[in-house]
Curated annotation (Swiss-Prot):
Organism encoding this protein: Mesorhizobium japonicum (strain LMG 29417 / CECT 9101 / MAFF 303099)
GO molecular function, one term: D-glycero-beta-D-manno-heptose 1,7-bisphosphate 7-phosphatase activity
UniProt protein name: D-glycero-beta-D-manno-heptose-1,7-bisphosphate 7-phosphatase
Cellular-component GO terms for this entry: cytoplasm
Site features described as Contributes to substrate recognition, chain residue numbers: 135
Protein encoded by which gene: gmhB
List of residues binding Mg(2+): 36, 38, 161-162
């Protein structure tokens, strides 16, 4: 469906993609599982623009599956500076994103919303905006998803492979995040937990399951 930008893509402005996936309906005040995409859900191939090159990171599949079973929205929040830099366009992003979602469906897991920000200080034309509020580490994508899905951000979790993901989570009011291949750290009001092995993945799955139980109690 075309939007007010006049493109066939779900752009709310030239550098912001917001797409609702599937028809799952959620009651208000649920937490969400926020996920970075490149380097978290799929292998990061440096500005991925070819759907044929997309490979999932299997570590994330049980986390998404657990959130799906728990009735918790799964929301992808991804910076896409390759678009701002002119390496590829929104059509290539759409093709890659479609492939990621297709591979996830083949594994029996589902995403409920995708948000992407293409703004970057090194961009060209209207995308050359430094420190755009939607670009992580700013919290704009998480906050916008929170408004659209009526989420409880404080109870939500974020998983990503960069400190910018954790900073976005903290600024959005989340209490904890999991850093792929990272180190644990505690900041005022926010805990960064490492995600490097099966034991630490178990901690993430337990946290998601706890949110599901809290929602049913």
């Amino acid at each position: 469906m075309a939007d007010k930008t006049g493109t066939p893509h779900p752009l709310t402005e030239p550098g912001v993609w917001i797409e609702r996936i599937g028809g799952r309906v959620f009651p208000p005040h649920l937490p969400a599982l926020f996920l970075d995409r490149d380097g978290t859900i799929n292998v990061d191939t440096d500005y991925p623009s070819d759907p044929a090159e997309i490979v999932l990171r299997p570590q994330m599949l049980p986390a998404i599956a657990t959130a799906n079973r728990a009735g918790i929205p799964v929301v992808v929040v991804t910076n896409q500076s390759g678009i701002a830099r002119g390496y590829f366009g929104w059509s290539a992003f759409a093709a890659v994103n479609g492939r990621v979602l297709e591979l996830l469906r083949e594994e029996g897991v589902f995403v409920d919303m995708v948000l992407a920000c293409a703004y970057h200080e090194a961009g060209v034309g209207p995308l050359a905006i430094p420190d755009h509020p939607m670009r992580k580490p700013n919290p704009g994508m998480l906050v916008e998803a929170g408004k659209r899905l009526a989420l409880d951000l404080q109870r939500s979790l974020i998983v990503g492979d960069k400190l910018a993901d954790m900073q976005a989570g903290k600024r959005a009011g989340l209490a904890q995040g999991w850093l792929v291949d990272g180190e644990a750290a505690v900041q005022p009001g926010f805990a960064i937990r490492p995600l490097r092995d099966s034991s630490e993945l178990g901690d993430l799955l337990a946290a998601i399951e706890t949110l599901g139980r809290d929602n049913r109690s």
